[in-house]
Structures are given as structure tokens and as C-alpha cells.
Amino acid sequence: MTFTIQHFIALLPLLITSATLVVVMLAVAWKRNHSFTATLSVIGLNLALLSLLPVLGVTPIEVTPLVLVDNYACFYMALVLVSALACVTLAHAYMESYPGNREELYLLLLLATAGGLVLVSAQHLASLFIGLELLSVPVYGMVAYAFFNKRSLEAGIKYTVLSAAGSAFLLFGMALLYAESGTLGFAGLGAKVAEHVLSGPLVSVGVGMMLVGLGFKLSLVPFHLWTPDVYEGAPAPVSAFLATASKVAVFAVLLRLFQIAPAALDNQLLNISLSVIAVASILFGNLLALTQSNIKRLLGYSSIAHLGYLLVALIASKGMAVEAVGVYLATYVLTSLGAFGVITLMSTPYSGRDADALFEYRGLFWRRPVLTAVMTVMMLSLAGIPLTAGFIGKFYVIAVGVESHLWWLIGALVLGSAIGLYYYLRVMVTLFLVEPGIRQHDAPFNWGQRAGGIMLVAIALLAFFLGVYPQPLLEILQHSGLALAG
């Protein structure tokens, strides 16, 4: 195939992110300067985000048999880039007093972002695997970045070993699927599934192994055991990246796969397996979060439940399913960045461990009322309370479930949401209690004048605005025609 200017434009976000990575690497090799490195990263990610505007003018376009850039890919590229941008902004103040080399964190984050961009535009199992590894491998280093802290090192080792096992399952599953189908392209697999050619035991084992690999990356039950430990041990900005960009990219490619091969969900075994995983993730995630006194662990278990809610829309996979997932992921990214942003500010500058214990937030309202308001809005949004962005996402998922008559899943979703309400309210109540005598962590006095603080206030206002008036988000989803090309 001939490479035209349209192909070049379609790859702009990925090319700009990769170029930023190289420039940052050369800048670090020339002279270490933390602020300069962070600024370069922010400029590069902003340019990559702006480059999506010309990309929309040439979509849908198949750049290679491996990569398809359409409106669907553009929407999720934007979510990945916004998540990365927020994490870089939060990391700058957080890393100011870090005793080791600070600049490499930005290199790893940019590399993982490039992997996320490849993943959301994948239309072939080979590009799915390449994107997934390009996303996962830098995260190993990011999780263990604060290696002076034993928990961070332990989290890094745990995530590396289990992630490698998940990738091995995924790769072996792909090999079995290829042996039976003779194709690795999503469209080719979709055609084979529609013709009912893929029905042997090898296919069942292959799909099962792929489900294990992707289930690990999405921290779905029963592949979730790493999640709370890794969220707790990783530096706060890295936990934010794991909860947002990493999950968005993997779920986007999984949804694309099922949208191109919708007949796969007609397979009773696969449908039942996904339904059981969804119910288990919703109930276990919420029930295990009830007992947590560590906010990062609580948000880790909460993310398991949220991915369970998203599986409901994936299983429905018709009507508004793609739009529902888009709305839910956009609102989930917004609120997760806000919640982890507050934890990051409370832990800034780095002092050996993060402010993740619930008692450290006791009476925060009396010291930092605006920061408390931000955290309150985030908790309400994660709980799916009306007038917050989270409610719109949950409403869409329930609507899709009702449309597809998935009554058991809707029941689990409602029950899970009711349980979730308790532990989100517990965090909120703690913020307004009487201050304790001993205080270990607190946000910097001038937190509201820093880039991270300004961003957090903007996120809280946006979460409230979208809850009251969600039309702009819905119009973006409809105008971008959040439908899959091909």
C-alpha cells in the first residue's frame, strides 16, 4: 500500500507522542532539569491532543492492516491523552522532593501513553498485543518508581510477575485462535464467527485464555488480586494513570473486538462466563471495599466494581451500548483523576509514603475546604448520585441493560451501587469530622495556585456541570459518530 499524507495525518497523535518521548530522552541525557522535562511532556501531550482535530478530517482511514483510525479511536485517544496530561501535571509537584532521579517517570509515562494510543486504534490481534505490552511494560517501572518504599517495590514485582503471566495467557490464546481461524484481523475473525466456522474446543480454550489475559489487565474478578496492593504501593500519580488511561485503552479495544464480531456473544458459554465475571466483579469489588481504611485500596476495589458495570454494556452490545461505554468511561476517567488528584496533592511533596490512610483525611474540611469540596464531588460522582457526571454514565449503562433484558445483571448493578454508596459516604463523612490532634499529611498551603490544584478544581466543576447538563458530552459522542468503521 502507498503511504499518503492522509495516513500521516491519521498517525499524528502517535507520532507527536513518540517525538516528545525522544526529545525528553535527549533533554535528560543533555542536562537533568525536572521542571523542563515536565514542561516538555505537557507541551507534547497538548500538541498530540490538538492534533486530533485534523485527524477527524481524514477518518475513518486504515493506516495499515494493523491500525484503523476512526472516530471511535479518536474519542478514546483523547481520553488516554487527557489522563496522561493530568498525571504529568500532578506528578510535577509530587516529585519535587523525590530523592532519586525524577525525569525518567515522564519517559515511562509517555511510552505507556504511546502504547495506549496504539491499543485503541488496533484492528488486529498483533497490534492489540504490541499496544498492550507497550502500555504495560513502562507501568512496571512506574509502579516501583518509589523503590525506597518497600510497598512500592513489592507492588512493582507483584504487578510485573502477574502481568507477564496475563500476557502469556493472552498470547497463547491468540495462537490457538489463529491455528483454528487462519486470521488475526478483527474483521476476519468477525466473518468467521458469523459463519459459525469457529466452534471447536481449541477456539473455546483460546478465547478463554484471551479472556484471562484481558481480565487481568482490567482487574476483573477473579483476576483482580493484584489491584489493591498495586494501587496502594504505586506513587499516587501512577495509581491515577493505572486507574484511567490503562483501563480505558484495554476496554476500548475489547469493545471494538466484540462490536466487529457481535455473533461471538451468541455463544452461550462465553455469554454466561462474561455475565458471571460481571456479577462477581460488581459484588466482590464493592463488598471488599467496605472494610478498607486505606483510600487507595478502597479506590482499587471500587475500580473492580466499575469495570463490572461496564461489562454489562459490553454484554448487551447493541443499541446504545457503544455510546453508553463512551459516556461511562469519560465520566469515570474524570472522577478517578479527581479522587487520585486529591490524594496526590495531600501527599505532595513526596515524603516516603502517600497520604492514603482514611484517618489522615479526618477534619480536612476545617483546613482545606475547597479541596474537601473537590473530594466530596468525586465521591458522589463515583457513587452515581444524581447531579454528578457519574450518574449519567450509570444511567446509560442501566438503560442499555434494560433494553437488552439483562435483568440479573441490572439487579447486581443496583445492589452493588447501594453497597458502594456506604463506603463513598464513609469517606465523605470523615472529611467533615473534628480534626485529630496529630496530623501527618496535609496539602501544601498554596495548592490552589499550582497547576495540579487548578486542574482539580476544574475537574470538580466539570463533573458537576456534566451531571446537571450532560448535553455537551452526549453531542461529542453523537457528532463523533461513536460507531465503529468497517
Swiss-Prot record:
Its EC number is 7.1.1.-. Keywords: Cell inner membrane, Cell membrane, Membrane, NAD, Quinone, Translocase, Transmembrane, Transmembrane helix, Transport, Ubiquinone. GO terms for molecular function: NADH dehydrogenase (ubiquinone) activity; NADH:ubiquinone reductase (non-electrogenic) activity; quinone binding. One of its GO terms (cellular component) is plasma membrane. InterPro entries: NADH-Q_OxRdtase_suN/2, ND/Mrp_TM. GO terms for biological process: ATP synthesis coupled electron transport; cellular response to antibiotic. It is a multi-pass membrane protein. It comes from the Bacteria. The chain crosses the membrane at residues 8-28, 38-58, 73-93, 105-125, 128-148, 169-189, 196-216, 235-255, 269-289, 304-324, 325-345, 373-393, 405-427, 454-474. It is found in: Cell inner membrane. It catalyses: a quinone + NADH + 5 H(+)(in) = a quinol + NAD(+) + 4 H(+)(out). NDH-1 shuttles electrons from NADH, via FMN and iron-sulfur (Fe-S) centers, to quinones in the respiratory chain. The immediate electron acceptor for the enzyme in this species is believed to be ubiquinone. Couples the redox reaction to proton translocation (for every two electrons transferred, four hydrogen ions are translocated across the cytoplasmic membrane), and thus conserves the redox energy in a proton gradient. Belongs to the complex I subunit 2 family. NDH-1 is composed of 13 different subunits. Subunits NuoA, H, J, K, L, M, N constitute the membrane sector of the complex. This is NADH-quinone oxidoreductase subunit N. It comes from Pseudomonas aeruginosa (strain ATCC 15692 / DSM 22644 / CIP 104116 / JCM 14847 / LMG 12228 / 1C / PRS 101 / PAO1). The gene is nuoN.
